[in-house]
């Protein structure tokens, strides 16, 4: 058995849009309304009616942090979530020094890993 020590990935590019829900903008939100803050890659749900507060980055009295957007579920440290797309999924990670790669909870026909060096 080989044990892989995970590294924190906070940013990458992907062909999957972050359009799970409308983007948060200042305003009044109804109970159970969901929105995203793309800069955080998070989905929030309003916990009260006529909610005028902004999501705080965590669950508070006004907003529940539901989880990562579809595009970022792949790195949310939860095996039970999946990034889903009809067709190919492409991820491009910044320069990493790594000797191992793991794909967990994956349903696909094939996986292609391409390692590139920029000159």
Where are these regions (language model features)?
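Tryptophan-rich substrate-binding surfaces of secreted polymer-degrading and adhesive proteins
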Residues: 1-76
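Aromatic, loop-rich ligand-recognition surfaces of beta-strand-rich domains
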Residues: 11, 15-18, 38-39, 68-119
């Amino acid at each position: 058995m080989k044990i892989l020590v995970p590294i924190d990935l906070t940013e990458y590019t992907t062909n999957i849009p972050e359009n799970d829900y409308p983007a948060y903008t200042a305003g009044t939100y109804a109970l159970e309304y969901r929105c995203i803050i793309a800069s955080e890659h998070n989905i929030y749900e309003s916990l009260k009616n006529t909610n005028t507060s902004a999501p705080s980055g965590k669950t508070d009295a006004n907003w529940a942090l539901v989880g990562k957007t579809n595009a970022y579920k792949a790195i949310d440290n939860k095996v039970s979530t999946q990034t889903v797309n009809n067709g190919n999924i492409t991820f491009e990670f910044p320069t990493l020094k790594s000797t191992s790669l793991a794909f967990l909870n994956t349903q696909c026909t094939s996986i292609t890993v391409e390692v590139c060096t920029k000159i």
